[in-house]
Amino acid sequence: FWDNAGRIILSTALKKLKEEGDCSVQNLYEVLVKSSLKDYSQFFLGTEAAPFTDEKGDKTTFSIRSTLVSQIACLKHLEEKSDFSIRQWIEDESESGWLFLTARPDQRKTLKPLITAWMDIAINALMTLDPDSQRRLWFIVDELPALQKLPSLEAALAESRKYGGCLMAGIQSFPQLINIYGHSTSQALLDLFNTKIFFRSTDPNTTSWISNVLGEAETKEVQENLSYGSNTMRDGVSLSQNNLSRPIVLPTEIMSLKDLECYVKLPGQYPVSKLAMNYKPSVKNSKAFVTKEEKPKKAKISQKIISQGKHSLNHEMG
């Protein structure tokens, strides 16, 4: 309830500010975070968000607002100085190159909602284009559970191929995905990834699940039975054949994989393969992260008064 109510409030605020012609990030942050309860309630009066921002229901309104504020705290770090648009970049067929959406470990918690939103915007922008089997646009997510829930992910995995979309995502373990998307949706997502690559895992539940995904192979086992009688003429040998199903890859084999070794399962009638890769160091072409220049802080009024006082005193003494 709290998350859904927050989404309604955020979308309503964006729509209303756009209609008023003042849809800047700072104005959005002022309305949702800094405004008083009275102004906050008045802003949403007569909109679909009104039931969640009613001044009379201050406890519920405060709880919903607190949930929303915790998710949009990253907006205060954005500046109104760039005309770059992710949607326009996706829609411009002449554009090429890479767009990196990343954050340092100490910034991830704050920027997680923002990076998730950017990724979702990019995926949705692709699926607004005309279908084109010759187009190729890759979405590579290094750690899928490191993001919040991507609303467009399931639809993108099922439909983006006709728009030229290719998605690659990495996870450490299946329970991480379940924690965000739930069991049924997580299973559906993994089914939609046609090509699967599994590296070493030490968790028994995860390795058992991987073994099941890689499948089983049917083998024929011949058993020889001997029978003995009181007379040598009654001795006999009989052969029986049994069909057995065994895992192609045992969980213990997944646990014992070396670094850069993996099992690959491709779509179609291709056998499961074990691969060994060679490590190729990346070339450092530029700095991994460049911090923006801090704006000079304005001097406090008290500091100005003291400074002016000292200047006046020195002037009189001179």
Language model: regions and residue ranges:
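Conserved ATP-driven motor cores of ASCE-family P-loop NTPases powering translocation/secretion/packaging/pilus
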Residues: 157-159, 163-263
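P-loop NTPase motor domains
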Residues: 1-166, 180-183, 192, 252-273, ...
